[in-house]
A protein has these predicted regions:
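Structural/interface elements that position substrates and couple domains in central-metabolism enzymes
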Residues: 1-316
Length: 316
């Protein structure tokens, strides 16, 4: 605010902090939960001076009825937002690393994460095929840049961001190993949106997945119940569905409820050989019982007998 917004606001000759208040209050809601959280989640406020911060505190307390936390300065309020997003990003990166170990060691990370959280001191988020959205993959870069300007390097934050950025590549590499290469394969992505039930695709992992798959020589199609085919095309994707035929593997990117109830036997009949469940949406046994290979985040690859010898030897 102080560096970029203040000069614009003062360009007309008025002085911030004396002629008008300047307050920063970070957004602490998310799509589809805005109204549910507005009056419940504490509003953090900071101002260009104490009077501005107090005015912001009074405004939100009066009109939202929400608890308010006055942290003092504009920079302090900005820091609160960044620290929350960075916590989420680094926590997910840790979960992704634990999941990667589990995949190799023949473990199922999901019940183990649940068990870890029971001590009351561990609060692990859950792994996935990638991190998208307006905030989590973006905001760490703001603090990294700010630290660089101060002569600092925030190595853990950089590492967490790099781990999460690599996740699509690493998971597609697992799929490639399972299918003994992706050149000439048809891979179908389920979900463009970065979150279930939300028609938003900012920094969606689907883009990274498509890039990695194309670079591996695969044909890539996608579907999302929240987007028309023309909208997918406008965003650089090729629309399709499993029933069109010729699909070798399905990659779940978004856990839309429309994708929950799948006839895996029908998928097998259509020629699908492997499923990469990027959001732990499906029961692995259901996939395997249909004779498909199941690849899950944090779960060693498993296959039904119909494809174990035809595709690849997998961990059991």
């Amino acid at each position: 605010c102080r560096q970029h917004l203040l000069p614009i606001l003062e360009s007309g000759g008025l002085k911030g902090g004396s002629d008008f208040h300047i307050v920063f209050s970070p957004e602490r809601v998310k799509s589809q939960l805005v109204f549910a959280r507005l009056s419940k989640t504490p509003k953090v406020v900071g101002g260009i001076n104490a009077a501005s911060a107090a005015a912001g505190e009074q405004f939100y307390g009066r009109w939202l009825g929400a608890p308010t936390i006055n942290v003092g300065t504009l920079e302090a309020a900005e820091f609160v937002k960044l620290s929350g997003m960075i916590y989420r990003d680094v926590n997910i990166a840790l979960a992704n690393e634990l999941a990667r170990f589990a995949e190799t060691a023949g473990l199922n990370v999901w019940p183990l994460l649940d068990a870890s959280d029971t001590d009351g001191e561990t609060h692990l988020l859950r792994p996935g095929i990638g991190v998208g959205g307006h905030c989590t993959p973006v905001y760490p870069h703001f603090l990294i840049r700010g630290a660089t300007l101060l002569g600092l390097r925030l190595e853990l934050i950089e590492l967490g961001r790099n781990i999460n950025d690599r996740q699509p590549q690493q998971q597609i590499e697992r799929l490639a190993q399972t299918l003994r290469g992706l050149a000439g394969r048809h891979v179908h992505i389920l979900g463009l949106a970065f979150r279930p039930r939300v028609r938003e695709d900012a920094y969606t992992t689907a883009r990274s997945l498509q890039t990695v798959l194309i670079n591996s020589g695969a044909k890539v199609t996608i579907e999302d119940p929240l987007y028309e085919a023309s909208e997918l095309v406008a965003r650089g994707f090729v629309p399709g569905c499993v029933k069109d035929g010729g699909v070798d593997a399905v990659v779940l990117n978004t856990a839309h409820p429309e994708f929950e109830d799948v006839d895996f036997l029908d998928w097998r009949a259509q020629g699908v050989k492997a499923v990469l469940d990027g959001r732990a949406l499906w029961c692995a046994d259901d996939v395997i019982d249909a004779g498909l290979i199941y690849l899950g985040i944090g779960i060693a690859a498993r296959a039904g007998t119909a494809h174990e010898t035809a595709c690849v030897e997998v961990h059991t």
